[in-house]
Design a protein with these regions (language model features):
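Class I S-adenosyl-L-methionine-dependent methyltransferase catalytic core
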Residues: 1-118
Length: 118
């Protein structure tokens, strides 16, 4: 799996092992971002059930201002952390290890708003 376009183009990222996570295929991600291209630059992204973080990292690579990645699976969270460091996106990505409902409640209380949600 790799980042398709933007500042991190071509960088290979890892996916959690096992059957608990099914990463979004490169070609699917490419098509989604081709459709959303005008909305990505400067956007604030929320990636629920983020797995490897591929959707959020792709968005940030293509110019999104920031991303919040949420996953309840500890293995997935560890892979996201490693991918985030590898991509040097620590300053633009926040990773939350928690249930999506708890994360959404926490983000609402903090008045966080998002332009794109995956």
């Amino acid at each position: 799996m790799r980042i398709i376009a933007g500042t991190a183009r071509g960088t290979v990222i890892d996916a959690p092992l096992g059957r608990d996570t099914r990463p979004t295929l490169d070609r699917v991600r490419e098509n989604v971002f081709n459709i959303l291209q005008q909305q990505v630059r400067g956007a604030r992204v929320l990636d629920l059930f983020s797995g490897s973080g591929a959707m959020a990292f792709e968005a940030v690579s293509r110019g999104a201002a920031s991303a919040v990645l949420v996953d309840v699976d500890k293995k997935a969270h560890q892979v996201e952390e490693a991918n985030c460091r590898k991509l040097r996106m620590d300053d633009r990505c926040r990773l939350l290890l928690m249930d999506w409902q708890a994360a959404v409640s926490q983000l609402q209380r903090a008045d966080d708003c998002f332009n794109l949600v995956f």
